[in-house]
Amino acid sequence: LVKRIKGVKRVAFAPLMPKSESFFMLADGGANNECRPEMLEQFGMMGSVYMQKVMGVQKPRIGLANVGTEPHKGGELQHAAFALLSENKDVHFIGNIEARDIPFDAADAVVCDGFTGNILLKMYEGVAMALMNKFKAVFKKSLKNKLAAEMVLNDMKAMKKELDYNEY
């Protein structure tokens, strides 16, 4: 049975995004461009519940997307959200997360305002497409590379599907 999470007033666009070993939730990926700190706290609560109940993560790690890992980094929104998430006993808040660490299992759910989240989402999409184009170019360079491509073709197709933004 689906029901509302107590204390959550605003929903977020929260896609599951690929990371090195599995997936993470990005909340908000673009629905709420301007957020209040309470909204980011609520996104953390939603991410925690979803990752636990649906994805089976026992103690989901919630991170706040920011320009640095130190608590004093970011603007007023990030400072206030950091304080709220730190005090919230319903989430396992692990602190600030830098964008470069997100794909490497830094957190199970990453919270941010929708403006920042949409930039992260679109960057993810672009990097995935650029990498696939690079792989194609390398595999077309020589006969040896073309033969190597044939050996890993099924794995490359699976990776392409996993990185396809239409999948998330």
List each language-model region with its residue ranges:
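Intrinsic structural disorder
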Residues: 1, 24, 73-77
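Short beta-strands and strand-loop turn motifs
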Residues: 25-28, 61-67, 113
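Glycine-rich phosphate/diphosphate-binding loop of Rossmann-like nucleotide-binding domains
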Residues: 33-99, 108
